[in-house]
Curated annotation (Swiss-Prot):
Keywords: Chloroplast, Membrane, Photosynthesis, Photosystem II, Plastid, Thylakoid, Transit peptide. This is Photosystem II 10 kDa polypeptide, chloroplastic. It comes from the Eukaryota. Coiled coil: none annotated. PANTHER family: PHOTOSYSTEM II 10 KDA POLYPEPTIDE, CHLOROPLASTIC. InterPro entries: PSII_PsbR. Residues 1-37 form a transit peptide. Pfam families: PsbR. Belongs to the psbR family. One of its GO terms (biological process) is photosynthesis. One of its GO terms (cellular component) is photosystem II oxygen evolving complex. The gene is PSBR.
Amino acid sequence: MASTVMSLKPAPFSVEKTAVKGLPSLARSSSSFRVQASGVKKLKTDKPYGINGSMSLRDGVDASGRKQKGKGVYQFVDKYGANVDGYSPIYNTDDWSPSGDVYVGGTTGLAIWAVTLVGILAGGALLVFNTSALAQ
């Protein structure tokens, strides 16, 4: 009987990369693209907005049954430099135009706005009419 050598070790598995004509390569190339933040921008508020956000919990525990540590959002005041627990509007009253009672575009701007609105509504009505049974 002839003895054959059998090994229980797995053979190394390798896949050869072959380029197929007509297909783009899916291999990623290294690039030098890098995203970097410009720096920390702190919010400046002259006056606080909203209420102070003090917590008064029943029996001193929150909804999950844990005692409050007293930190809340106040731990981020130094980091963000603003009243983090209050209402912070997008528009500040200091930035508003002093002549805000009058539309800057005038009657010409209002006419252009009205014609644009009527055109959009008429176009939508025309599309609905053309795709309905009434158009037949």
